[in-house]
Amino acid sequence: MKKQFLSTLLAFSLAGAVNAEVVVGVTVSSTGPAAAIGIQSHNAIKLWPDTLGGEAARYIVLDDATDVSKAVRNVRKLTSEDGIDLLVGPNITAGALAILDVLVETKTPMISLVGSGSVVQPVNEGGREWAYKMSQNDNLMAQALVEDMQKRGFKTIGYIGYADAYGDSWWREFSA
């Protein structure tokens, strides 16, 4: 997965090879309710390479505090003030969905850290043509879970999920 991410990052960096530096903006939830995920993402960024495609790489990391409006403000700042070539994050579905319009306005590609397929599907709708993600979509995970439960003879299951964009996405998959 790391190689795939770095290859994608490299591909985006080569598109702007005129620049002497590849600027990658990152918005993650280092604080707030999703900090358990965001802190891990923030720490992983420290391991990223100093160069991408032979060009110097600079990473600008902002905390969106698990706040959708702050994620949007972060992305606006990163695109307008910092002139990023690529965005990584957010790490919550609601934040990733909220910034899609900014991606279209600024023509900035995003590699999202969320699990929900709603950030990238349907493709070419609502800014999703600028969105990519690292993990498999919910439907693949849900399909594997359902197949396993069927093999084990489960007839009835219960669903407990969060009342947010990610929980809604899972509910749709299990309801299909």
Residues of each region from the PLM?
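Cofactor-binding loop segments of dinucleotide-utilizing enzymes, especially the Rossmann-like FAD-
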Residues: S29, D64, Y162
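Gram-negative bacterial Sec-dependent N-terminal signal peptides
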Residues: M1-N19
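Cleaved targeting-peptide boundary
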Residues: N19-T27
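Glycine- and acidic-residue-enriched helix-capping/strand-helix junction motifs
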Residues: G32-N43, A165-R172
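Beta-alpha junction/loop-to-helix N-cap segments that form part of ligand/metal-binding clefts
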Residues: V23, A36-N43, T51-P122
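Active-site pre-Tyr helix/loop in NAD(P)-dependent dehydrogenases
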Residues: T27-S30, S116
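A generic secondary-structure signal
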Residues: L47-T51, K77, E147-R152
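Extracytoplasmic ligand/sensor domains, especially the bilobed periplasmic-binding protein
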Residues: I84-A176
